[in-house]
Amino acid sequence: MKSLFIASTMVLMAFPAFAESTTVKMYEALPTGPGKEVGTVVISEAPGGLHFKVNMEKLTPGYHGFHVHENPSCAPGEKDGKIVPALAAGGHYDPGNTHHHLGPEGDGHMGDLPRLSANADGKVSETVVAPHLKKLAEIKQRSLMVHVGGDNYSDKPEPLGGGGARFACGVIE
């Protein structure tokens, strides 16, 4: 019995805490609403910040802006008389009301994540870390967004890093 207790204790010590995680399905952001699934993002709690394990396809090769957005919706909306894909997701998650896009290491939007790099086949398979986000509960009932273009982590020369249109969106549940 004592051996069983010791063995059980050793197993439990090897896994001191099972970090919370969730999988977000990412869909094309279209003027008519969410389109076909283009991949997944597994978000998990880990030392150093939330980890975002991204597996996506159908992107253009190169860099893409990647952010947590305010609202849990990927529905289109109307802005300046035009339909905008995934507009209902709102802006970048910014609980501190900084109104600044300074990247994942900066003191701006908490939703600024490291940009993604799609290979020549338009696929992304990488894990990025959000050092300012520690708990999954902080971003539940929000959305993830991948933009068409890169992100320079600045509001100049274009606002919000110049990432351009919304390419893919998923709701964090």
From Swiss-Prot:
Its EC number is 1.15.1.1. It comes from the Bacteria. Transmembrane segments: none annotated. Its cofactor is Cu cation; Zn(2+). InterPro entries: SOD-like_Cu/Zn_dom_sf, SOD_Cu/Zn_/chaperone, SOD_Cu/Zn_BS, SOD_Cu_Zn_dom. GO terms for cellular component: periplasmic space. It catalyses: 2 superoxide + 2 H(+) = H2O2 + O2. Cu cation binds at residues 67, 69, 92, 147. It is an enzyme of class 1 (oxidoreductase). It is found in: Periplasm. Keywords: Antioxidant, Copper, Disulfide bond, Metal-binding, Oxidoreductase, Periplasm, Signal, Zinc. Destroys radicals which are normally produced within the cells and which are toxic to biological systems. Belongs to the Cu-Zn superoxide dismutase family. This is Superoxide dismutase [Cu-Zn]. It comes from Brucella abortus biovar 1 (strain 9-941).
